[in-house]
Amino acid sequence: MKKPSSKIREEIARLQDQLKQAETREAERIGRIALKAGLGEIDIEESQLQAAFEEVAKRFRGGKGSATGKRQAGESRTGTEPSAALASGADEGGSGEA
């Protein structure tokens, strides 16, 4: 038996809420770590910081290559990447900057 569209919409809304909560937790975690490491005190452009986080992510994933801080065509921001989570957490938190 197929689900009615209203039930599917409810399930999608519930899953979107769960995703948002998970992204918020990830952003807060990475933001706390970044602040403990002193990144809140460094005056750096967001694109440079993004590139640095992408390099760190590649290092931990075992990948190679340099990061540019720019997304390639077709790439999307899913919230599962540390750099994406930090960017959203930094915008929301803001308490670590002087």
Swiss-Prot record:
Q: Where is this region: Disordered?
A: 60-98
State the encoding gene: traC
Q: Which taxonomic lineage does the organism of this UniProt entry have?
A: Bacteria, Pseudomonadati, Pseudomonadota, Alphaproteobacteria, Hyphomicrobiales
Q: Which UniProt keywords apply?
A: Conjugation, Plasmid
| Lipid metabolism recorded as keyword | no
What is this protein's name? Conjugal transfer protein TraC
Q: NCBIfam families, per this entry?
A: CjTranTraC_Agrob, PRK13848.1
**InterPro entries in alphabetical order:** Conjugal_Transfer_TraC, TraC
Top-rank taxon of the source lineage equals Bacteria
Which species is the source of this protein? Agrobacterium fabrum (strain C58 / ATCC 33970)
